[in-house]
Amino acid sequence: MGTAIHNSVEDLCNLDISDRDDDETGWLHSCSRETLEKRWEEEKILFSETPRHPRWKDESFSTALDGLIGAISILFDKAMLPVEGLSSVSVKTWKQVQDIVVATEERLESQCGRLMGRLDLLIKDLEDEVNDSLIVADLKTGKPPEEELSENVSRQLLFYRDLMKQNVAEEQALRAEGWYSYNKSVYR
């Protein structure tokens, strides 16, 4: 389920909407659903081709759609735009969300070439535009922590941040965040 959500968020961030009218609404909800359905089917095929005992849970699609909507809500928050129902989002508003996205599914590699990772999203930090700050966002589709991040997740975020620091200008501020789409929470 997580991979389908991740890939759908990336697809929507990279969606070419240049041929649409800026005032058009009613498209994002159906587009999000169609994108997730496509990615859901891809994951189902991969799951079926992999030898394992559990069964695919088709009934989890609505949970995945909620997760996708949660991740989109966090993107709206980071773009400093009011969270709207997806059906009322205009093309112009989604372009503003897309404008903060610097990269999706970016491969990270240390200068020595021995350490690697893959970030989900790299976005502009609009809270600190003066310093041209960036946020390394790792989408989390599992259960969010009750109080603070687990040591493993915290270490993963710091690892991604440190790998990314090797690839940006020295003066550029950078932080890593875990985005839990389940309850739309963000952890640093």
Q: Language-model segments: which ranges?
A:
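A non-catalytic, helix-rich entry segment at domain boundaries
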Residues: 8-102
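Mg2+/Mn2+-dependent nuclease catalytic core
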Residues: 97-188
